[in-house]
Amino acid sequence: MNAFAHAWYYISILRICQCVQGQKTFFVQGVDKSIFLVYDALVKAKASLSIKLLDAFAFFIFLADPKKPFHRMAVFRLSFFFLTHSFRFASSVKRRANLMRTVSDYFGCLVFDDRVMKARLNADIYQSLHKTIDQGAKLDAGVANAVAAAMKDWAVEHGATHYTHWFQPLTGITAEKHDSFISPAPDGGIIMDFSGKELIKGEPDASSFPSGGLRATFEARGYTAWDPTSYAFIKDRTLCIPTAFYSYGGEALDKKTPLLRSMEALNRQAMRILKLFGNEDVKCVRTSVGPEQEYFLVPKELYEKRKDLIYTGRTLFGAKPPKGQEMDDHYFGVVKPRVAAYMADLNEELWKLGILAKTEHNEVAPAQHELAPIYTTTNIATDHNQLTMEIMQKVAAKHGLVCLLHEKPFAGVNGSGKHNNWSIATDTGVNLLSPGETPYENAQFLLFLCAVIKAVDDYQDLLRISVATAGNDHRLGANEAPPAVVSIFLGDELQGILDAIENDTPYEAAKKKTMKLGVDVLPRFARDTTDRNRTSPFAFTGNKFEFRMLGSSNSIACANIMLNAAVAESLRIYADRLEGAEDFEEKLHEMIQKTIKDHKRIIFNGNGYDEAWIREATEVRGLCNYPTTPDCIPHSLDEKNVQMLTAHKVFTLAELKSRCEIQLENYCKTVVIEANTMIDMARKQILPAVESYTAELSGTVAAKRTVAPELACLYETGLIYKLSRLTDQIAVKTDDLEESLLELKSVSDITEEAYAIRDAVLGKMAALRTVADEAETLTAEKHWPFPTYGELLFGVR
C-alpha cells in the first residue's frame, strides 16, 4: 500500500470514530483538524511522510482510551466499509495532489535532457558530448560508455526495463525493437547493463522495411545510429533512443537521415551568406518547425462497428447527415467535457516527454480538433510530431475514443491537415526571416526572403511531391485546403517592398494603424502590417513561412527535407556570386532585384480556392499543377531535382529512385485496400441490409393487402422499387470495381499501376459509393449495418 493508501487508512479510522453515535469524546473533538493536517502534509511532502510516524499518530488516536471497548467494536463493525472505500479515497487524494502539481514540476520528467545530463555526467564528459551535439565532433568511445551508463541508471530509476533504437523507416510511422537491460551475473542472478556500443549502434532487419529495391529479402543487415541531437526518452517503461536507419551499403532507409543532411546543407550555405554580412559570432544555422496537428475523435464503440475505419482509417461509405459544418459553430466552440478530459490527459503525457504542446481547440468540422506545439529545431520537431500522433491515439483509447489522423475520414466536411511553420535562426538567437522594424532597409532579411521565393519557384514540384499521398489527394484543391498548385503569399507590406526594389522606386512604408473598436473599455493595439491568407499553400506569417499542404498523417520530415534543400541551393547560388563580387552592395541589390523579376510568378496574394486562379497559374504563369499523387511522384527523378538533391548530398540517386518507387507502392496499396474493403462491405453488409429491409416492406404490403386488398400501398411499393433498383446497381458496381482490381494484376510497372488506379479504380469506387449512400438514405435505421455519419460526427458528448 503506498503512502496515499496508508493515509486514507488512518483517516478512515478517524472518520469511523467520528461517526460513533453522538459521543462527544476526544475521538470526535479535533478529528477534522487532524484529517486536514494529514492531507496537507501529504500534499506538501509529496507523500514522503514516514509511515512509522503515521502509525504512531493513528495508534495514539485510536488507543488513547483502551477502557472503552465500544469504540473498538464500532471500528470492527465498520471495517467492511473501510476495506471497500479506502483505496477509492486514496485515489481521490492522489488525483487532488496531482492537480496541485504545476506543469514545471513534471515537464520533461521522462526525457534524458540537458538538465539530466548536466546533473549525471561529469564536466568533461558533458562538454565532450555537447561538442558532438553542437559541432558534429566525433563521439569518443569512452564518452559513449559514460553516457550509456548514466542513461541506463536514470532509466532504471524511472522504471524502465528495456531500451530500443527508435527510428522512422519509410513506412511513415516509427519502429522499435525492445532489448532488456539484463545481463547474467556469475552467481546466477542478473545485472542491469547498457554499453556505449549498444547506445550508438543497433542492427535491425533491413529487408522487412520498405526499401524501394535498396535491399533484397536475403540482404537483411541494416544499422541504426544514435542521433545525439534528439534527447532519449522513456515510453511504456522502455528507454527510447532516437536513431537514424541505414542499410549495409550505407543508403538511408529512413526519414531522419536525409532530414539531418538537408539541415546540414542549409547550415553550410547560410553560414557562407552570414559571413559576408559580417556575422562572425554565428557558429551554426538551424531551421525550426512548429507543426499544427489536426485530428478527429469518434467513439470507440462506433469505430469498431465500421470495417472501413478499421482497415483504412477513413469512411468509404456514408450519406450526408442532416447537419454538418454549415453553421460554423464548431470552430473555436466550447470543448465538450469528454474531449476536454482527453486533451488534459494528452497534454500531461506530452509534457512529460518534453513536447511543447501549446494550443488546443475545436476545428471546423464536427468532431475535429487541433493541437499545436511551440516550434523547435526541425529534427526534434519531427521526432516530437511522430510521438504526438502515437500518444494521441493511445490516450484516446483510454477515454473510449479513437483518434483519426487520416486526411479525409469523412466526405462532405473538412479533412485534416498539418501546417508546417518553418523558419531559419542562428545559434545566437537571430531569426533570419524576421523583417525587423524597417524591412526595406534590412538587406540580410531580403536576401533570405528571396532565397525562399526562388527555392519555392524552382522546386515547386518537389514541395508538391513531399506531401503526396492517397489520403492527401482528397484534401488538396477541395476548397478546404490549399490547391495542388504551389504559390507564396507575402502580404501587402512585403509585396510593396519587392515592387519598389523591382522598379527601383522609393518605398513609402505604410503608417502603423491602431485598431479602434468603438468601445472605450476595449484596449487599442497596433494592427498587423498584413492580413492572413488561409488559402495559400505557402504563406509568410510575420517571421516564418507556413507550409499548409501537408496531410495530417504525414511525417513532417519529407516536406522539410525538400524545403531545406531547395533553400540551401538558392543560398549556394547567392554565395557563389557574392563571394567574388567587387562591389558587395551593388551585387546584392542586383541579385535581389533579379530574383524578384525572375520568380514573381510564384507570388499570389489572392484567393487560392478560386478556379480562375488555377487557370491563371497554369496557363499564364506556367506553374505546376499535379492534382494527384501519380501525377507528381515521377517528377522526383527530373534531372534538375536529382542534380540539386545529390549535389547537396541530401539523397543519392539510388535513394531517390527507391523513394519514388516506395511512394507509388504506398499509393497503390492504399487504394487497393480501400477498394477491397468497399467490396467486402457492399457484399457482406450493405446488400444484405437493403435486401432485409426490402423483404420487410414486401411482407408489410402482403399483410396489408390480406386485410384490405383494395389498398394501393404506394409508399411501400415505391420504396421497394427504389431499393430493388439500388440493390441491382450496388451489385453491378461492386462487380465492376472487383474487375478493375483484377486487371491491375497484369500491370508490372508500378508507375503504370498508379496511373490505372487514378484513371479507373477511383472512379469505380466513387460510383459504388454514390448508389450505396443513396440506399442508406432510404433504408430504415434499424436495418443499416454500421454507424452513420450523424452518429460518428456527433457521438462524442
Locations of regions flagged by a protein language model:
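Short, Lys/Arg-enriched N-terminal segments with co-localized hydrophobic residues
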Residues: 72, 79-99
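Active-site core of metal-dependent hydrolases
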Residues: 106-219
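C-terminal amphipathic alpha-helical interaction region
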Residues: 592, 599-797
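Short terminal hydrophobic/aromatic SLiMs and anchors at protein ends
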Residues: 5, 10-16, 34-36, 40-44, ...
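Active-site-proximal loop/turn and secondary-structure-junction residues that shape catalytic pockets
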Residues: 143-147, 167-169, 197-198, 245, ...
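Glycine-rich, acidic/polar active-site loops that bind/position phosphate-bearing ligands
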Residues: 220-405, 414-417, 424-661
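Targeting/processing segments of secretory and organellar proteins
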Residues: 2-5, 18, 25-28, 33, ...
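Hydrophobic alpha-helix feature that most strongly marks membrane-spanning transmembrane helices
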Residues: 168, 186, 397, 427, ...
